[in-house]
């Protein structure tokens, strides 16, 4: 049976009357049964998806919640309030292929009222507990994949409860594929202390780590744009050569001469034990080297003892001849500098791998971060800060669609402040118990105003607040015109043009006819009445703005009245609304066919 035929049959089983959940699970399991590596579970129906098959979301701004920075080049961040399947669907229209980094911290499905499905908490003894969680995640990750740029990366925090299931599901070709898997980070989020000590003494292997699954959409494994470093308390005694002013001596000899009263035996322990040795290394790091083999430099000719500095492939090598062959000197300074540990140490360091240690130390202060209360749900700012520092560019767009307390935005704004970046962040969260406004938004506002952060105000940031609103997919001509107006805020988000202009090419704007948004570098106009197109075309021809112009033009078809724009059509980007919106949602989540539903 072909996959398409199988999918249709499964859909009929799901909607058939007279079957209970066990019957459906058995039938679907029989259809899916095959000898292959992968995962089979019953895809559980979800109310949010069913709503989206009959309705389509738009984004509506709440302008009274906007925070505008005085800084002219301040990045604009976005908070979207709404069920995150609705928010993600809207983002497939505004940001498909535009998101560089996704970080999410989804519910771990502990059974302790952390995961709701169809408005009900999923209990630990629910037979479909894992199926519901996987169904929930697959729908959202499928949309997330559409949002990632070609070299985009997603980080997914998870515990051991669903790690194995999530890994197999993400490895499937329906989502990211095994070739896109980068690695799994092991994050030390707790220590064996307190109540865990008794459990450990009784023989229990206590849990200290959580996991972060990493996938790169394009399959690129080298996702670290910036290296992270952990402090190294011991000294590598291979770094035993002291080279200065052409004179080669030993580190032992030079340290003894500088600090004759210090008594020691093993150099490997000396860095940890002796503040004098740490001071000596810091002051002389430019002159300390290790001897190592080297290949690929047969074109270099040196006399015995001669040292030459060679630049190759963007890297500096210190080559010398020991009388038999070429060797290299490895500088200690490449392993010395500021570290990314909890203490923000400076000294000997090693490049961090997949073991991210000591984040349990941050947990003692995490409740104070952002100056909001969010029980058992916050991740440390330092954790997400370092993920972004490692993997993002300074102009990256970052998404978190399980925003919770808003740590991702807080971390991103801090990183921008530290490295001069202009990253933009989009947060999505629901409005359950007022979380979006009372916690997520409040924390962002606090951070911008300098409350609940380690290093003061983050005022050079602007913030816009949107909510999702559902509109019927079945459109009468009047409803289509209404949708074009209702979707205006979503078009602003799509084009990243937010400041409303009172004029467009010398014409006064009118909310019933045309609205215009832009910042001087580009303009977006939304035309609601086709009668004014000749006047708009004439204004464009007369003014010939030197910035890019996008015109969203109401049209009952997919033709944005191109012929009426005449000669200026080639100077602007013309898009018909609402067709461009409806077509996008139909590709992402086809509308429910009421006739077929009734027949099934």
PLM region spans:
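PRPP-dependent phosphoribosyltransferase catalytic core
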Residues: 414, 418-600
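DnaQ-like (DEDDh/DEDDy) 3′-5′ exonuclease domain used for proofreading
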Residues: 1-103, 111-130, 139, 305, ...
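Secondary-structure transition/capping motifs at alpha-helix termini
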Residues: 95-99, 146-152, 172-184, 390-396, ...
């Amino acid at each position: 049976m072909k996959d398409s035929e199988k999918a249709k049959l499964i859909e009929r089983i799901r909607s058939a009357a007279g079957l209970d959940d066990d019957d459906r699970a058995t039938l679907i399991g029989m259809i899916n049964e095959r000898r292959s590596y992968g995962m089979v579970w019953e895809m559980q129906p979800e109310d949010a998806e069913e709503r989206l098959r009959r309705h389509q979301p738009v984004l509506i701004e709440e302008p009274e919640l906007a925070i505008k920075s005085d800084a002219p080049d301040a990045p604009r961040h976005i908070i979207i309030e709404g069920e995150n399947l609705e928010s993600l669907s809207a983002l497939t229209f505004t940001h498909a292929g535009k998101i560089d980094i996704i970080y999410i911290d989804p519910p771990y499905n502990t059974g302790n009222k952390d995961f709701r499905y169809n408005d009900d908490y999923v209990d630990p003894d629910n037979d479909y507990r894992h199926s519901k969680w996987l169904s929930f995640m697959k729908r959202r990750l499928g949309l997330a994949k559409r949002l990632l740029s070609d070299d985009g990366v997603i980080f997914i925090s998870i515990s051991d409860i669903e790690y194995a299931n999530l890994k197999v599901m993400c490895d499937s070709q329906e989502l990211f594929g095994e070739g896109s898997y980068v690695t799994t980070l092991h994050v030390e989020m707790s220590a064996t202390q307190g109540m865990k000590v008794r459990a450990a003494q009784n023989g229990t292997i206590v849990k200290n780590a959580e996991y972060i699954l990493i996938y790169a959409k394009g399959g690129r494994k080298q996702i670290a744009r910036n290296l992270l470093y952990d402090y190294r308390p011991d000294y590598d005694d291979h770094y035993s050569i002291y080279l200065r002013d052409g004179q080669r001596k030993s580190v032992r000899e030079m340290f003894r001469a500088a600090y004759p009263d210090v008594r020691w035996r093993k150099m490997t322990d000396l860095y940890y034990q002796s503040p004098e040795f740490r001071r000596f290394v810091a002051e002389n790091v430019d002159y300390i080297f290790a001897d190592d083999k080297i290949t690929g430099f047969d074109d270099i000719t040196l006399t015995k003892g001669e040292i030459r500095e060679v630049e190759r492939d963007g890297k500096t090598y210190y080559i010398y001849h020991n009388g038999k062959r070429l060797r290299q000197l490895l500088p200690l300074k490449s392993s010395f500098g500021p570290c990314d540990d909890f203490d923000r140490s400076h000294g000997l360091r090693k490049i961090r791998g997949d073991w991210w240690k000591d984040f349990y130390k941050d947990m003692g202060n995490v409740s104070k971060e952002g100056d909001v209360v969010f029980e058992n749900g916050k991740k440390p700012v330092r954790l997400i800060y370092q993920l972004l520092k490692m993997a993002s560019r300074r102009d990256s767009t970052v998404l978190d669609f399980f925003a919770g307390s808003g740590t991702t935005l807080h971390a991103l704004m801090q990183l921008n402040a530290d490295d001069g970046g202009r990253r933009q962040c989009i947060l999505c969260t629901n409005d359950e118990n007022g979380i979006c406004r009372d916690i997520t938004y409040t924390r962002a506002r606090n951070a911008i105003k300098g409350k609940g952060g380690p290093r003061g105000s983050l005022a050079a940031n602007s913030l816009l607040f949107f909510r999702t609103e559902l509109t019927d997919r079945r459109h009468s001509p009047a409803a289509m015109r209404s949708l074009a107006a209702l979707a205006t805020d979503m078009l602003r988000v799509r084009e990243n043009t937010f400041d409303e202009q009172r004029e467009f090419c010398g014409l006064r704007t009118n909310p019933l006819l045309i609205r215009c948004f832009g910042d001087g570098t580009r303009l977006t106009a939304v035309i609601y009445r086709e009668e004014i197109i000749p006047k708009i075309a004439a204004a464009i021809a007369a003014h010939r703005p030197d910035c890019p112009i996008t015109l969203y033009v109401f049209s009952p078809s997919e033709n944005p009245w191109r012929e009426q724009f005449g000669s200026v059509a080639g100077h602007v980007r013309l898009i018909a609304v609402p067709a461009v919106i409806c077509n996008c949602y139909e590709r992402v989540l086809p509308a429910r066919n009421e006739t077929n539903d009734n027949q099934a």
